[in-house]
């Protein structure tokens, strides 16, 4: 049970779990986030520890269409959080929209803030029900998706 391993809750240790090491997850996480940082650097934001150095301030809008799992890899990197906590405790319905913005509150230093997560108002606006996908049963006896 992943909830029993404290490392999963820590940004800099979640990948130390034996199953994660066996699957070489940290290598792939670093590959993905490294490429993501290259995209951000092309727009003037260079990763420096847990924040970004602003080398070219701008108001660019970057849009990424991605799967729930990849989305949380990118967001966990931007917010310096363990993706395990995000993967297992937050749910984004298919076609939902998550918005983050960069904030340069001190000259030359930027961070990212999540302004909205899993927004599905576009579905409600057109009387479309949200999908149950990515969710699990509320009660174990329910006839819905289990672990």
Per-region residue spans from a language model:
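Phosphate-handling substructures
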Residues: 1-43
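Short hydrophobic/aromatic-rich motifs at helix boundaries and adjacent loops
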Residues: 8-9, 69-72
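Acidic, low-complexity terminal tails and accessory targeting/binding regions
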Residues: 46, 50-61, 73-147
